[in-house]
């Protein structure tokens, strides 16, 4: 995801502007991506992962309760919904926000440059913003691997606060560069939410882990709603970022209150 915006700009579109691109120019590239995904999927389906003792029911054993009876899991699924949703909202639409402002006469610079040319291909600043957003998430995940001594509730709460503040700052200043920082703060969210959602679920853990994946649908719905909001606003993206703020605030709520275990399986 870090290199994908540059890949699309330079390899798929060849540095052309959006107005110059037509569907025939991207068919071969995306067919190639489909082949890669198919190969990776085949490899993953043939991998045998070890079972972790105590995380699922014994063979033939029937679970007495529904996983939905655990409130911290149910709210965790919603947390994943908002997390994946706001993550994709920023990653997918920050470039459209920047392009809108550029078309209105705004100029964005990167170390004094209004574009970045590599190998004769002009990589626009909006694509660079998306790359830096995903890159910040990558760096954050590398750093967060050394934060095991900090409780996941604390990591999640701090990250949600700063992500919300950065997004509000982008709205107030009408500046997409502030959204780039959100990627760094998003880096710890998946692991923190997942850890909190399956806490003390014992033999329900395996089923709960699969249940949590329902929440990833937020990655398709929230960006869609944001795009519809932008269309309703006449193509203006500025105020649509409140969708991201709402998502960050729910994640903060989950970190502080929603993740508390009211009923445990162990």
What is each of the regions a protein language model found here?
Residues 18, 46-65:
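Flexible cytoplasmic inter-helical loops of multi-pass small-molecule transporters
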Residues 1-13, 209-223:
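Glycine-rich segments within core transmembrane alpha-helices of 12-TM secondary carriers
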Residues 12, 137-152, 230:
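Helix-to-loop junctions at the C-terminal end of transmembrane segments
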Residues 4-9, 13, 66-131:
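Extracytoplasmic gate region of multi-pass secondary transporters
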Residues 150-193:
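C-terminal transmembrane helical hairpin of 12-TM major facilitator-type secondary transporters
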Residues 187-205:
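Intracellular juxtamembrane helix-capping segments at the cytosolic ends
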Residues 1-48:
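Helix-loop-helix hairpin linking two adjacent transmembrane segments in secondary transporters
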Residues 39-46, 242-266:
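Multi-pass alpha-helical transporter architecture, strongest
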């Amino acid at each position: 995801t870090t290199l994908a915006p540059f890949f699309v700009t330079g390899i798929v579109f060849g540095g052309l502007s959006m107005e110059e691109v037509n569907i025939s120019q991207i068919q071969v590239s995306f067919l190639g991506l489909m082949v890669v995904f198919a190969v990776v999927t085949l490899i993953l389906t043939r991998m045998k992962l070890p079972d972790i003792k105590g995380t699922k029911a014994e063979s033939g054993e029937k679970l007495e309760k529904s996983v939905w009876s655990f409130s911290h899991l149910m709210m965790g699924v919603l947390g994943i919904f908002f997390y994946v949703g706001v993550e994709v909202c920023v990653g997918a639409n920050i470039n459209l926000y920047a392009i809108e402002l550029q078309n209105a006469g705004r100029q964005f610079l990167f170390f004094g440059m209004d574009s970045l040319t590599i190998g004769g291909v002009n990589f626009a600043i909006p694509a660079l913003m998306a790359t830096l957003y995903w890159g910040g998430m990558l760096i954050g995940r590398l750093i967060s691997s050394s934060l095991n001594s900090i409780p996941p509730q604390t990591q999640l709460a701090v990250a949600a606060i700063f992500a919300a503040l950065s997004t509000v700052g982008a709205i107030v200043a009408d500046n997409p560069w502030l959204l780039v920082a959100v990627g760094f703060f998003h880096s710890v969210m998946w692991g923190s939410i997942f850890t909190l959602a399956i806490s003390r679920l014992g033999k329900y853990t395996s089923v709960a882990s699969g249940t949590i994946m329902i929440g990833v649908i937020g990655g398709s719905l929230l960006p869609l709603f944001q795009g519809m909001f932008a269309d309703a606003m006449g193509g203006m993206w500025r105020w649509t970022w409140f969708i991201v703020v709402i998502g960050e605030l729910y994640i903060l709520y989950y970190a502080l209150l929603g993740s508390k275990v009211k009923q445990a399986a162990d």
